[in-house]
A protein has these predicted regions:
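Double-stranded beta-helix
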Residues: 2-10, 14-17, 37, 95-131
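A short glycine-rich, His/Asp/Glu-containing loop-to-beta-strand
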Residues: 13-47, 53
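Short strand-connecting beta-turns/loops that link adjacent beta-strands
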Residues: 30, 52, 71-72, 101
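Short beta-strand His + acidic residue motifs that chelate non-heme Fe in jelly-roll/DSBH
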Residues: 47, 66-67, 88, 93-99, ...
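Glycine- and acidic-residue-biased ligand/ion/polar-headgroup-sensing regions
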Residues: 52-65
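Short, surface-exposed charged micro-motifs
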Residues: 56, 77, 95
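Residue-level signal for short segments within beta-strands and strand-turn junctions
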Residues: 60, 68-70, 108
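Short acidic-glycine-tyrosine-enriched beta hairpin
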Residues: 71-90
Protein backbone atom coordinates (compact mmCIF):
# COMPACT_ATOMS: atom_id res chain seq x y z
CA UNK A 1 0.00 0.00 0.00
CA UNK A 2 1.26 3.49 -0.67
CA UNK A 3 0.37 7.15 -0.36
CA UNK A 4 -1.92 8.42 -3.08
CA UNK A 5 -3.07 11.83 -4.20
CA UNK A 6 -6.86 12.19 -4.18
CA UNK A 7 -8.51 14.02 -7.07
CA UNK A 8 -11.37 16.34 -6.14
CA UNK A 9 -14.69 16.76 -7.85
CA UNK A 10 -15.81 20.28 -8.66
CA UNK A 11 -19.26 21.67 -9.34
CA UNK A 12 -18.26 24.04 -12.14
CA UNK A 13 -21.28 26.25 -11.45
CA UNK A 14 -19.53 27.30 -8.23
CA UNK A 15 -16.60 28.56 -10.30
CA UNK A 16 -18.56 30.10 -13.16
CA UNK A 17 -20.70 32.30 -10.92
CA UNK A 18 -17.57 34.23 -9.93
CA UNK A 19 -17.69 33.61 -6.18
CA UNK A 20 -14.90 31.02 -6.07
CA UNK A 21 -15.04 27.26 -6.16
CA UNK A 22 -15.95 24.21 -4.13
CA UNK A 23 -13.71 21.18 -4.48
CA UNK A 24 -14.95 17.97 -2.87
CA UNK A 25 -12.83 15.01 -1.75
CA UNK A 26 -14.35 11.63 -0.81
CA UNK A 27 -12.44 9.71 1.87
CA UNK A 28 -12.23 5.94 1.46
CA UNK A 29 -12.87 5.40 5.17
CA UNK A 30 -14.89 7.42 7.71
CA UNK A 31 -13.07 10.29 9.41
CA UNK A 32 -13.47 10.59 13.21
CA UNK A 33 -10.90 13.29 14.10
CA UNK A 34 -9.23 16.20 12.35
CA UNK A 35 -6.34 18.48 13.30
CA UNK A 36 -4.92 21.76 11.98
CA UNK A 37 -1.14 21.60 11.69
CA UNK A 38 1.67 23.72 10.35
CA UNK A 39 5.30 23.18 9.45
CA UNK A 40 7.78 26.02 9.37
CA UNK A 41 9.85 26.56 6.20
CA UNK A 42 12.90 24.26 5.88
CA UNK A 43 11.78 21.94 8.70
CA UNK A 44 10.11 18.53 8.78
CA UNK A 45 7.18 16.87 10.46
CA UNK A 46 6.77 13.13 10.42
CA UNK A 47 9.37 10.37 10.19
CA UNK A 48 6.77 7.93 11.43
CA UNK A 49 3.82 5.70 10.62
CA UNK A 50 0.50 5.04 12.32
CA UNK A 51 -0.23 1.37 13.09
CA UNK A 52 -3.90 1.90 14.00
CA UNK A 53 -5.41 4.41 11.54
CA UNK A 54 -5.36 5.86 8.05
CA UNK A 55 -4.65 9.56 7.62
CA UNK A 56 -5.63 12.20 5.07
CA UNK A 57 -3.73 15.47 4.54
CA UNK A 58 -5.44 18.51 2.99
CA UNK A 59 -2.87 21.23 2.28
CA UNK A 60 -4.36 24.70 2.71
CA UNK A 61 -1.21 26.80 2.24
CA UNK A 62 2.39 26.34 1.14
CA UNK A 63 4.56 23.85 -0.73
CA UNK A 64 6.56 20.84 0.34
CA UNK A 65 7.70 17.30 -0.34
CA UNK A 66 6.21 14.19 1.26
CA UNK A 67 8.63 11.26 1.41
CA UNK A 68 7.61 7.62 1.85
CA UNK A 69 8.98 4.17 1.02
CA UNK A 70 7.42 1.82 -1.48
CA UNK A 71 6.91 -1.91 -0.85
CA UNK A 72 10.51 -2.61 -1.94
CA UNK A 73 11.89 -0.07 0.56
CA UNK A 74 12.80 2.54 -2.08
CA UNK A 75 12.07 6.20 -1.27
CA UNK A 76 9.30 7.92 -3.19
CA UNK A 77 8.63 11.66 -3.24
CA UNK A 78 5.40 13.59 -3.76
CA UNK A 79 5.52 17.34 -4.36
CA UNK A 80 2.54 18.93 -2.59
CA UNK A 81 0.99 22.37 -2.55
CA UNK A 82 -2.14 24.29 -1.70
CA UNK A 83 -5.27 22.27 -2.49
CA UNK A 84 -3.58 18.86 -2.62
CA UNK A 85 -5.13 16.01 -0.66
CA UNK A 86 -3.19 12.84 0.20
CA UNK A 87 -4.38 9.50 1.54
CA UNK A 88 -1.81 7.80 3.81
CA UNK A 89 -2.79 4.22 4.66
CA UNK A 90 -2.23 2.68 8.08
CA UNK A 91 1.35 1.45 8.48
CA UNK A 92 2.83 3.58 5.67
CA UNK A 93 5.88 5.61 6.72
CA UNK A 94 5.85 9.31 5.86
CA UNK A 95 7.64 12.60 6.49
CA UNK A 96 6.89 16.08 5.14
CA UNK A 97 9.60 18.63 4.34
CA UNK A 98 8.39 22.24 4.13
CA UNK A 99 9.80 24.16 1.15
CA UNK A 100 7.72 27.13 2.33
CA UNK A 101 5.65 27.50 5.50
CA UNK A 102 2.89 24.87 5.24
CA UNK A 103 -0.57 24.78 6.76
CA UNK A 104 -2.69 21.67 6.46
CA UNK A 105 -5.51 19.69 8.04
CA UNK A 106 -5.03 16.03 8.93
CA UNK A 107 -8.03 13.72 9.12
CA UNK A 108 -7.79 10.44 11.07
CA UNK A 109 -9.90 7.28 10.77
CA UNK A 110 -9.51 6.52 14.49
CA UNK A 111 -9.25 8.93 17.41
CA UNK A 112 -5.64 9.45 18.47
CA UNK A 113 -6.54 9.08 22.16
CA UNK A 114 -8.31 5.75 21.49
CA UNK A 115 -5.12 4.19 20.09
CA UNK A 116 -2.91 1.91 22.17
CA UNK A 117 0.08 2.99 20.05
CA UNK A 118 -0.88 5.85 17.71
CA UNK A 119 2.60 6.50 16.28
CA UNK A 120 5.87 4.68 15.58
CA UNK A 121 8.88 6.92 14.86
CA UNK A 122 11.58 6.04 12.35
CA UNK A 123 14.09 7.81 10.12
CA UNK A 124 13.28 8.32 6.45
CA UNK A 125 16.49 10.24 5.85
CA UNK A 126 15.00 13.73 6.27
CA UNK A 127 16.31 14.38 9.77
CA UNK A 128 15.89 12.97 13.24
CA UNK A 129 12.44 12.05 14.49
CA UNK A 130 11.35 13.59 17.78
CA UNK A 131 11.48 11.37 20.87
Amino acid sequence: MKIKRLQPECNLATVRDGRGGIFTFYPEKPVVEFNFQFINKNTIRGNHYHPEFDEYYLFTEGNGVVVTRNDEGKEEFLYVGTGDCLYIPQGVSHVTYAITDIKYVTFLTKKWNDCEKPIVHEDLGMGAAPK
